[in-house]
């Protein structure tokens, strides 16, 4: 039967109400409020950049500046739950800031461009102790400017670890008026290595090659001119080849279950002396080796290498990486491995992904089956009955069309002539009809077109036993009664009962 239109209107709200609100809200992070992409800050002031994102589960936020991750080592920067706070803004703080929020269903980025304005008028800078000496000041001194670093984004990483035999470059590119000079020191002592005496155009970079353990220490660049001085310090750790292989910390990755077509993720945290290589692998199930161009062996099993995203450096010295799986299918189910490797070896940990079956498997449209069952019962019964009636009528017509016309009755026997095949009575030697004649019966000359028997010519007629291919069956019961009188003759009384059954 056809569903009611009212039911069709009420069905979607009922289905939506069957799911709890919490389940319906789960998904990737989304914006909770609008933001102004261009932010302006005054030199020396404090600026706050908001990251108004929300999601279920709550997302993990990470801030970057010009592509470099902001961590606790940045003294003037503080990552707060509401956003990023920058104190005592400097000129080099200008740049592109990105807040990236990630949960198990996806990620969202909020971008800012920070512009730093200098509200200090030229000529009001302190000129140093020698400014109080007498004499005529150079008119150009009114435009003097203290040195400043021009590439602060390349100086964020102040703690550097390198193995023996490697190299490192320390940069302190600066500008000012007059043109500043730079001096490199190690552990507060002037450098005597040849690397410190490079050509003028490379003086802003200190290159340390073929590192040795004694190269470990604090390296400081001091940039100065008549207007002032600035400095920056790097800590270099030269380690004797990595002492241990990476270690996977925490409980991740963990076994995960996802709905068909849903989104989920695995995460992996690796602790290593140097930045490790983190790679995700998926085990190739038996019989599916031909689907992949290349596989690798790990622990005696075959795995396929999956695309791996960025490796994030955390303030505690560990490294984090996530594997995102979208639009999960049955092929995505199986064992996944997080592999962390460095020059000393590798460590791995496995987890399983379970993909729930598709609640709506492909099949024939439901409307076709419902329309077939919605027919009224009289129609369902009447169609087969009509077909049977038409078929019976056709069969009857064919049966009548194949019947032959009436056959003429046989001629009566000549008087005094004994037909062959007659028998004698035991007592009176009277003639009796033969079984063949009786079996032929008086119905030999029946007209089959009318379906009624013709009157017999003679009970013992010798007519030939022949009939059409389609003929009525004749069953004859003969009851013979013999009465013996005192006279010498016998009387035969024959009673014939004919049962005619027409069969096509």
UniProtKB/Swiss-Prot annotation:
Entry-listed glycosylation sites: 111, 231, 255, 293
Listed Gene3D superfamilies: Immunoglobulins (2.60.40.10)
Cytoplasmic side: 400-504
Keyword Signal applies: yes
Key word Cytoplasm present: no
Residues in compartment: Extracellular: 25-378
Membrane topology recorded in Swiss-Prot or TrEMBL: Single-pass type I membrane protein
Signal peptide stretch: 1-24
TM ranges: 379-399
Compartments, record wording: Membrane
Disulfide bonds: 51-99, 172-221, 268-338
Residue ranges, annotated region (Disordered): 123-155, 407-435
Compositional bias ranges of the Pro residues kind: 407-418
Any one GO molecular function term: fibroblast growth factor receptor activity
Alphabetic keyword roster: Disulfide bond, Glycoprotein, Immunoglobulin domain, Membrane, Receptor, Repeat, Signal, Transmembrane, Transmembrane helix
A single Gene Ontology CC term: plasma membrane
Pfam family, one: Ig_3
Domain of life of the native organism: Eukaryota
Residue spans of biased composition, Basic and acidic residues class: 423-432
Quaternary context: Interacts with FGF2 with a low affinity.
Name of the protein in question: Fibroblast growth factor receptor-like 1
Organism of provenance: Homo sapiens
